[in-house]
């Protein structure tokens, strides 16, 4: 009681205005409004998105979850995998910094560091980026990229290269300082 520390070791559930969190092990620190969850962590947001991890620190006042170890965020539009980063369940803005991948229905985005805003469907990737476009059978690589899903466009800088399969076993490579790739005008 003096420590202002609540804990459980054999499964528990915590609910706030935005999320419903379940885990095997949990610690809540009243002074910092920090909930530390470990082992089979499952967070469901009021919009239906889920976050699954083995360890996260969740701050109830801000809605920020710091993720440690393999973690997956799934919603209707996409699925995100990371091994370290943070996700704000109130603003739907995330920043991932280790082995991070965004899986869209038509492309996969990888990078050393990923920023994602679910509200605007905007993502940026920094360092060793790779974008696999399944619709156009192409791979785009570079050092920095920004993707605007709603506008069906992206630009890539820092040793940007686009590799497109023309026919089976034959590809075309396009390289430039900056590459801008857009979908068909009538479909944007």
What residue ranges belong to the model's regions?
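Structural signature for solvent-exposed beta-strand/loop edge elements and short helix-capping sites
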Residues: 1-188
């Amino acid at each position: 009681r003096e420590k202002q520390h609540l804990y459980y070791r054999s499964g528990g559930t915590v609910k706030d205005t935005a999320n419903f969190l379940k885990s095997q092990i949990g610690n809540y620190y009243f002074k910092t409004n920090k909930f530390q969850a470990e082992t089979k962590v499952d967070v469901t947001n009021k919009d239906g998105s889920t976050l699954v991890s083995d360890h996260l620190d969740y701050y109830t006042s801000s809605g920020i979850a710091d993720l440690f170890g393999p973690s997956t965020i799934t919603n209707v539009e996409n699925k995100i995998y990371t091994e370290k980063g943070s996700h704000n369940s109130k603003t739907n803005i995330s920043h991932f910094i280790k082995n991070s991948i965004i899986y869209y229905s038509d492309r996969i985005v990888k990078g050393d560091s990923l920023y994602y805003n679910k509200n605007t469907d905007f993502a940026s990737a920094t360092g060793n980026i790779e974008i696999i476009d399944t619709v156009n059978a192409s791979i785009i690589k570079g050092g920095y990229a920004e993707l605007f899903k709603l506008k069906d466009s992206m630009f890539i800088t820092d040793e940007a290269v686009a590799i497109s399969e023309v026919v089976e076993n034959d590809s075309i490579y396009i390289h430039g300082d900056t590459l801008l790739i857009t979908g068909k005008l009538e479909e944007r």
